[in-house]
Amino acid sequence: MRSIVSFLFAAVLLSPLAAVAQVQPHRAEYTLRLGAAANAARIGTAVHDLTQDCAGWHLKRDIRTEIALTASWKMSLASKLESDETRNAFRYGLVQTQNGNPRDVKGKVQKQGGELKADIVFGTSPPAQFVLPPPTLLPVAAINHLIERLNAKAASFPALMFDPEVIGDVFLIEVTEQDRAMLRGARPADKPVTLPPGQSWPVFM
């Protein structure tokens, strides 16, 4: 699975002795377009909402798209994720909808006895149970890992990450920092976006 991620933003915490970068609670809203051209068609939106309390991280993601395959045939896809993550576990509920037909997915990934075990239920099917490779990162931990490596000036690196939304399994991503000049500029019709203070990196994954 490969996709272009044009921008990765991280708030940076600075200690008196050294710079330490880590993920911070945040909300991000995206416009999804088909392709990188300046006139690429808009096909949907995505909202990423990450909060934290004493119980751990809470990640919500809401993705909605509509793609016109022909003049008379459109495909609408939606994915709504709600999840909780601690150092040792990731629990989530996911509703995926295609052309108005919903499918529920519930899952848990947890460290047990030195192993990382997944237990996932797709709709009414029996639970899928399997063991993930030891280096697998949970979603919020994966963001932290990317920030740490980029802040350490790593230009390119791999990472194993559990993906609850597309495949419900682990996949390998290759992260490469890009030249900032490669970022597509904002369109005149787009509303202005002001980034919060902090470090940012354009990357390809």
List the model feature ranges, each with a label.
Residues 6-16:
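Bacterial N-terminal signal peptides
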